[in-house]
Amino acid sequence: MKSIGVVNFSSKPGSVELQEIEYPLFGDDDVIMQVEAVSVCGSDLHQWHGTNSWEVNYPVVLGHEFCGVIKELGKNVKSAGKWQLGDRVVTETAAVIDTDSPLSRQGKYNLDPSRK
């Protein structure tokens, strides 16, 4: 199965294009989500302009802030009983989280000033 993604394929400014992307293999611990909305973040713009200050493993799909609906659950996810088909979900991303910081150890990594 394939989908369309906005792919940043090199560090050169403007090296972004729509590409067909093959779905990864689906495993027992995985969830398939139908994306309903994606936002453009400052880091996406930095990559578009080639001005990012972090290491990137090209090619990379842009648009890491998104929401949607669960369409498929792996066997282990189903048995855990926390998620159901049709649940509305959002993503939360961070490039760097210090798992040893006091805030991270309390489950408040989103408040850690070292988070990037």
What residues fall within each predicted segment?
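Short structural boundary motif marking the start of a folded domain
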Residues: 1-6
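Short N-terminal binding/cap micro-motifs at the start of the first secondary-structure element
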Residues: 12-17, 42-43
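Glycine-rich beta-strand-centered segment in the early N-terminal region that forms part
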Residues: 24-38, 51-102
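Cytochrome P450 core scaffold surrounding the K-helix E-X-X-R motif
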Residues: 43-49
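Short, solvent-exposed secondary-structure boundary/capping segments
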Residues: 45, 80-82, 112-114
